[in-house]
Structures are given as C-alpha cells and as structure tokens.
C-alpha cells in the first residue's frame, strides 16, 4: 500500500507529499535524483522517460499523482504516452492527474494524457486548475509589488481568473485518493473569479498598502521568466498567455468544482499569502 507522487521535490509535488504524509498515508516519492531524501516518504528514482521504471513504480500502488513537467511540448507528449502505457500495464488502484492549467479540450500533451487515462480502464480523476497563485511569486511580479506597489501580470484588467495554489491542489489530491467515486474532471480555483484589480487589492490588503494592477504583454512575461525556466519553456508560456488573451475569462465551472464535488474551498489570496509565510 503506497501513494506514488511524481515531482516529489518540485513546486507542485512537494506539497502533495507533505499533505499525504501529514494524513498518515504511506508515500513513495518519485525523483530523478537517486540520492534525494524526501521527508515523510520512501524515495524512488524514476523519470517520465522510462516506461519500465514507471510500471515498476505504479504496480500495486493505491494511488498515483502525475503532472507534466515544464519542458518542451514534444517531450511532454512523449511523457504523456509513457504514463498512459505504464498505467495500462501496472493498473494502480487510482490515478490523479493535474493539468497544471493546460487545456484538455484541444490538442497537446495534457489533452493526450487525459484522453489516455479515460481510455485506460483505470479509476482516475483530472484536476483542472486555471492559473497558479505561485506564478505571482516570480521575482518580476512579487518584487514589483514590494518595490512599486504594482502587480504586473499578462492578463487584461477585466479578465477574471479562478486562481488556485499548489496547497489547494494537495488538499484535493488527498481527498480524491479517498474518494474513488469522484471521477472525471474536478476544477480547482477561487469562485467567483477575480479580476486583476481585485487580485491586486487582495495583495494590498495583506501587505497593508495600496497595490494597483499592471497588465503586461505575453512578450514581457516571456522575457521575465526566461532566466528562470529557459527560453523554450518561456516561449511556450508566452504562447499560452497569448491564446488566453482571446478568451472571455479563466473561471472554473461551479458544477464540477472541488467546492461542489468534494466540499473543499480553495484558499483566498490573503490566506494563501499567510500560509506561505509572506
């Protein structure tokens, strides 16, 4: 009996490991580093590139949490196919996949993985956040809040978003591992959704000062994140925000939300800032 967590030392996987361990769940942390130590978990070196390694990790697991890393789309598609192949062979009891905000209704790696899980015959759920609050911790964003009392982000002023945090994802993963009756897509995020000025207002209320929203272009976003994640992934991120600019909103649908399906309400922006110690 164990729960297998991909990216266990990363931004999204680490909170899942911590949440499951705190709940007394036996955790197997998958990492690329065979010498990595993950508190509260047994560590196994296994990457998305080896189907055999994934099969070995998934076999007899009570639950598997997967999400695709921020690499090239070509690599993401390869990883998606490998995950599906391993799930079909190993037959874990339940799989939870976080799209990390990527759409699943059009082509791409996230869509391919969601479709593959749906056709695998294995119990599964797909967590669908929109945008992560952790994006706002990028130096370009949070430093501007601190130094200029402005919150820069590549969305329109009137564009509402159902923000979610990695901590919220971890809470939902824990619940879904105990609720195999909840399958299909589970949307995770604040509802009602917040516009840019409302988000800036939440930052201002937390820090005790007036913070204004500052819309920037996807190209400005690309330039700001490239030193952190690399030019290729940064270009992909900019493309996502460019495509997003044509949409009316990124609000979750309340009918398939974690609030309705699991009784879990995501943190407010202020609660999240407090929980991460800012």
Which residues does each predicted region cover?
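A hydrophobic C-terminal alpha-helical subdomain
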Residues: 219-278
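Short, basic/glycine-rich phosphate-binding loops at helix/coil junctions
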Residues: 63-66, 252
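Oxidoreductase cofactor-interface core, primarily capturing Rossmann-like NAD(P)-dependent enzymes
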Residues: 2-37, 49-55, 59-61, 68-78, ...
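Conserved N-proximal alpha/beta basic substrate-recognition cap immediately N-terminal to
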Residues: 81
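Active-site regions of enzymes building and remodeling cell-envelope glycoconjugates
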Residues: 39-47
């Amino acid at each position: 009996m164990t729960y297998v967590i991909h990216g266990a030392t990363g931004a999204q996987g680490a909170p899942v490991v911590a949440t499951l361990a705190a709940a007394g769940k036996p955790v197997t942390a998958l990492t690329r580093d065979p010498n990595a130590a993950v508190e509260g978990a047994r560590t196994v070196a296994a990457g998305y590139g080896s189907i055999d390694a994934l099969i070995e990790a998934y076999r007899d697991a009570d639950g598997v949490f997967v999400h695709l890393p921020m690499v090239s789309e070509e690599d993401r598609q390869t990883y998606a196919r490998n995950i599906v192949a391993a799930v079909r062979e190993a037959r874990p009891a339940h799989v939870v996949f976080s799209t990390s905000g990527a759409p699943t209704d059009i082509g791409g790696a996230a869509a391919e993985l969601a479709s593959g899980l749906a056709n695998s015959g294995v119990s599964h759920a797909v967590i669908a956040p929109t945008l992560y609050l952790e994006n706002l911790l990028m130096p370009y964003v949070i430093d501007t809040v601190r130094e200029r009392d402005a919150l820069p982000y590549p969305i329109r002023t009137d564009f509402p978003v159902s923000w979610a945090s990695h901590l919220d994802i971890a809470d939902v993963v824990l619940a879904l591992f105990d609720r195999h009756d909840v399958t299909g897509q589970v949307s995770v995020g604040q509802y009602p959704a917040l516009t840019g000025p409302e988000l800036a207002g939440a930052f201002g209320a937390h820090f005790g000062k007036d913070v204004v929203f500052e819309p920037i272009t996807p190209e400005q976003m690309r330039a700001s994140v490239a030193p952190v994640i690399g030019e290729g992934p940064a270009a992909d991120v900019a493309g996502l925000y460019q495509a997003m600019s044509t949409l009316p909103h990124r609000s979750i649908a309340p009918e398939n939300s974690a609030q309705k399906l699991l009784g879990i309400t995501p943190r407010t922006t202020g609660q999240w800032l407090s929980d991460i110690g800012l």
